[in-house]
């Protein structure tokens, strides 16, 4: 599966006033680039913009925190429910890291706190010893953390809040 990344902004050129006369009438304009938010529900970045626009409007006076996902490794849950590790792209040709970078950028754009579990949890299920210690099943489920893995996540969250 996969959702296209998309863009956070579109960009166009607009004439803007930079000078006025004593009556307050604009007398001189220059051309400037201007960005507009993209709220395209068919793209990941558009969805992030739509989500944060809603949350920042509705909860304008609250602390808002977003977290990145963990690193991903192989998981098999039977039938066609097979999750490949992050070294494989999704069907749109993007890797997990691109979505993580988009979440980091969205936190910057929308001025929300970020807990970067991808970077700061220390969980790396691509390696056998890490998978055996911190994930449900070294052979079939390197996607879901076990109790030790959840403790690492909790520690990373507590360091940030």
Cite the ranges covered by each PLM segment:
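Alpha-helical cap/lid subdomain in secreted, periplasmic
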Residues: 1-161
């Amino acid at each position: 599966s996969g959702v296209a990344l998309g863009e956070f902004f579109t960009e166009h050129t607009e004439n803007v006033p930079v000078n006025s006369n004593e009556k307050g009438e604009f007398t001189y304009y220059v051309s400037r680039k201007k960005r507009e938010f993209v709220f395209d529900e068919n793209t990941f970045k558009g969805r992030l913009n739509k989500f944060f626009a809603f949350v920042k409007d509705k909860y304008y006076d609250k602390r808002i925190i977003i977290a990145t996902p963990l690193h991903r490794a192989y998981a098999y849950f039977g039938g066609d429910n097979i999750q490949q590790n992050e070294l494989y792209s999704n069907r749109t040709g993007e890797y997990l890291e691109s979505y993580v970078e988009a979440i980091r950028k969205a936190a910057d754009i929308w001025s929300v706190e970020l807990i970067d579990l991808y970077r700061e949890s220390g969980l790396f299920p691509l390696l056998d010893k890490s998978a055996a210690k911190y994930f449900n099943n070294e052979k079939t489920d390197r996607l879901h953390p076990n109790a030790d893995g959840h403790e690492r996540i909790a520690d990373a969250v507590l360091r940030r809040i």
